[in-house]
Amino acid sequence: MRTATLYRYSVPMEAGVILRHQRLKSRDGLLVKLQQGELSGWGEIAPLPEFSQETLDQAQVAAECWLQHWVSGVESDDSVLPSVAFGLSCAQAELKQTLPLSADYRKAPLCTGDPDELFAVLQALPGEKVAKVKVGLYEAVRDGMIVNVLLEALPDLTLRLDANRSWSRAKADGFAKYVNPALRSRIAFLEEPCKTRAESREFARDTGIAIAWDESVREADFQVEAEPGVAAIVIKPTLVGSLARCQQLVQQAHQAGLVAVISSSIESSLGLTQLARLAAWLTPATVPGLDTLDLMQAQVVRPWPDSPLPLITTEQLGVVWHR
């Protein structure tokens, strides 16, 4: 016999979490639990405002429709809504025990630009010293100076940068101007520096700073292929879709000689632990981009190892659907 439950969570965020144009005050999402006999599986459905094509309410309607079929014994195709497809495919994979349990809890720490603070964090990191810096929120020149300071201060540091398509070509050049050419090879990649792919390609060609595709991966005309200056693709499963789709993208990236990075869309601790398992399975040689839990004030159902944040249990969540 099959049963399914859909829970809704809302976790307060730390002050100062800004998406593209708005402050994120709480992270809201759905958790799905599938039960079949003695086996169960969980998944998270949490569209990210400003980044997901669907709203949480739309995701809930689609999830309820899929679950109604599932409890009746009907196997439906993946939802066309990426967050729903991802959450339901995780729940199914756990139920069928096809999502490996081993996890990669390494994370590229999100860095605010203070070298002393980052130095302390990196000293405690095992192995590869990789950190991520969000650029494009302030002046491009300031970003360039900060990146340069970090690379100079920490000789074994590699940086991943993310601009979210926020720069014109002129601003991107302003950033590059302040990064010493001798240090640029330690920028693993800069995600989508410019507003268009063509400008980003030209930027990589002219500056020698490698780029990665992020937003582009979710666009209908995108194809994974080797290109000069392109080092990686960033895969955010909540925005991309099912586990099968993520697996396909990773395989295509590796065939093209590109790095594939599994990355967070600010999921709860439950979703993050599943992303850590996905990364250990599909991209074991690459540090995933999962350092977002500390943006929240609580964990949900499943804890992240060694996190001091309080844990919200299943009993504390609201049930929005059950059959």
UniProtKB/Swiss-Prot annotation:
Keywords: Lyase, Magnesium, Menaquinone biosynthesis, Metal-binding. It is an enzyme of class 4 (lyase). It comes from the Bacteria. Its cofactor is a divalent metal cation. GO terms for biological process: menaquinone biosynthetic process. GO terms for molecular function: magnesium ion binding; O-succinylbenzoate synthase activity. Mg(2+) binds at residues 162, 191, 214. SUPFAM superfamilies: Enolase C-terminal domain-like (SSF51604), Enolase N-terminal domain-like (SSF54826). Gene3D superfamilies: Enolase-like C-terminal domain, Enolase-like, N-terminal domain. Pfam families: MenC_N, MR_MLE_C. InterPro entries: Enolase-like_C_sf, Enolase-like_N, Enolase_C-like, Mandelate_racemase_C, OSB_synthase_MenC1, OSBS_N. CDD domains: OSBS. The active site is at 134 (proton donor), 236 (proton acceptor). It catalyses: (1R,6R)-6-hydroxy-2-succinyl-cyclohexa-2,4-diene-1-carboxylate = 2-succinylbenzoate + H2O. Belongs to the mandelate racemase/muconate lactonizing enzyme family. MenC type 1 subfamily. NCBIfam families: menC_gam_Gplu (TIGR01927), PRK05105.1 (NF003473). This is o-succinylbenzoate synthase. It comes from Yersinia pseudotuberculosis serotype O:3 (strain YPIII).
